[in-house]
Amino acid sequence: MADRRRGAARGGAARPRRRERKNIPRGRAYIHATFNNTIVTLTDPNGNVVAWSSAGSSGFKGTRKSTPYAAQVAAENAARKAMEHGMRQVDVYVKGAGAGREMAIRALAAAGLQVMSITDITPVPHNGCRPPKRRRT
């Protein structure tokens, strides 16, 4: 009995949320390539997120997330989701120095998105924070 009342207060049965289909012919693709992962975000021209994917959300774990193939799969997944909303052309903005940055751009083009421009927006410090120490293996 208590379970029924608590469910009614929440609004009844939970319905699966349906993603509404937008019509966005041109947008932006942000590729954030770190040494551990690659995140691909596709937005409309105003910056509102249409679709996103990452190597981790594409099923890769651990050191496999940092491979170019994982970045390719992540970019394909994000492109497929964005093309469902009508996206055809993208301006690509790349940030970071990870292994997957080149492969992610190629995957966006191979998925059917027309790459209009590629801009590197990697932040470069003017001698700010001290970088991490070098790895010794």
From Swiss-Prot:
Chain intervals with Basic residues compositional bias: 15-25
Coiled-coil regions listed: none
InterPro entries linked to this entry: Ribosomal_uS11, Ribosomal_uS11_bac-type, Ribosomal_uS11_CS, Ribosomal_uS11_sf
The entry's keywords: Ribonucleoprotein, Ribosomal protein, RNA-binding, rRNA-binding
Domain of life per record: Bacteria
GO MF assignments: rRNA binding; structural constituent of ribosome
Signal peptide: none
Region described as Disordered: spans on this chain: 1-25
Record-level GO cellular component terms: ribonucleoprotein complex; ribosome
GO biological processes: translation
Assembly: Part of the 30S ribosomal subunit. Interacts with proteins S7 and S18. Binds to IF-3.
Similarity comment text for this entry: Belongs to the universal ribosomal protein uS11 family.
Role this protein plays: Located on the platform of the 30S subunit, it bridges several disparate RNA helices of the 16S rRNA. Forms part of the Shine-Dalgarno cleft in the 70S ribosome.
Annotated protein name in UniProt: Small ribosomal subunit protein uS11
Species this protein is from: Thermomicrobium roseum (strain ATCC 27502 / DSM 5159 / P-2)
